[in-house]
Every structure is written in C-alpha cells, then in structure tokens.
Amino acid sequence: MAHPTQLGFQDAASPVMEELLHFHDHALMIVFLISALVLYVIITTVSTKLTNMYILDSQEIEIVWTVLPALILILIALPSLRILYLMDEINDPHLTIKAMGHQWYWSYEYTDYENLSFDSYMIPTQDLTPGQFRLLETDHRMVVPMESPIRILVSAEDVLHSWALPAMGVKMDAVPGRLNQTAFIASRPGVFYGQCSEICGANHSFMPIVVEAVPLSHFENWSTLMLKDA
C-alpha cells in the first residue's frame, strides 16, 4: 500500500513486480553514472584552461561516443526484454477471472465456476469504517488464492478502462469488444489496491480495484459461501 511522502514503488507482491523493481534499480544506476560522468566532464571543461577548444577531428573520441552508448543501451535492453516476455507468459493458470470495466465500477466473473460473479463498487466516504481507505475500498473484493497462477481476462462494456494493480506489477487496458489477458502470482497474503488507469469519464477516480490474496483453503471456503449466496 502506498503511503504519504513515498518516493519508490509499492512493496512487491508478485515475482514479476520483484523483477520490475530490480530493473528499475538497474536502470536508475546507469542513469546516475551517466549523469555523474556528464557533470564531471562539464566541470573539468569549465574549470581548466588546458582544454583544447579547437579540435576539428578526433577518431578516438568518435569511436568512444558511438560504442559506449551502444553498450549502455544493450545493458538496458537485455533485462528489459527478459521482463517483457516474462510478463506475457501464462502457463497453466489455476484460476481464470474475467474483469469487465463499466462506467464506473468493475464486475468479476470466475469462469471456472458455473455461477460465481459479482459487481464491485466503491464504498462512499460516509460509509467507511475506521481503518478503511478513502476512494480505495470496494463492497466486494476480488479474492484469489496465493502462490497460484491467476489469469485475468480484461474487457470493457462501454468505454476504455484499464485494470491496474501496482503491487502485482499488472496493468492491462480494457477495450470494448476486445479481450485482453494478463496474469500474476500473489507471492504473499494480503489486500492489494489499484484503480482504473485510463480516463473513462466523470467518475474515473471512483472505480477502485481491491484484490485479496488468501491461502487456498480460505479461498475454497470463500467460493463455497459465494456459490451458496448466488
């Protein structure tokens, strides 16, 4: 969960998000080193009178400023491509959930069950209980078993939406008439918050996403109760 004055990302709750955090640190280190090098060159150039200001040609300098950026781009591209393919992998999902965006709420359908679906609306501020988060709580949470591959099918009923869950490293556009898919594995139990991340109208800010990751036995009990109430 994000908190005031936070500078970094949320704590990772999935293997993909852990990889994204590592890549962020890797890229940030490269940017920091480049910035330090440029700053050093500027300072030394300005502060010394020994710099030759009339160089018209230097084969060595041209080789360095061509090869070095190419190597740096390769150092950034290789781990980036690895994570890109990792995010697209969906191997043998244990559970498939269809998330449908509406103006302005989400509906969820557990496609492995005959009749397990519900709408998820934001809880108004005046109805919140102590300890709940304003604009982030919903009347029905999407409950998933932890340490299990979960496939999410994302679409929309009316306009463009986007199903985003930062702690899981997931963001997938919901497009009317199109079925997109993504996946995640919750590596620990907890309640994780997200929001619609595509401007979709007047109440765009009021369609939160709440995912609760629980042990498999708790998920089975929850699904049994939901099927009885259906």
From Swiss-Prot:
Top enzyme category: translocase
Known EC number: 7.1.1.9
Main localisation: mitochondrion
Transmembrane segments: 15-45, 60-87
Keyword Iron recorded: no
Purpose: Component of the cytochrome c oxidase, the last enzyme in the mitochondrial electron transport chain which drives oxidative phosphorylation. The respiratory chain contains 3 multisubunit complexes succinate dehydrogenase (complex II, CII), ubiquinol-cytochrome c oxidoreductase (cytochrome b-c1 complex, complex III, CIII) and cytochrome c oxidase (complex IV, CIV), that cooperate to transfer electrons derived from NADH and succinate to molecular oxygen, creating an electrochemical gradient over the inner membrane that drives transmembrane transport and the ATP synthase.
Stated name of the protein: Cytochrome c oxidase subunit 2
Species: Formosania lacustris (Oriental stream loach)
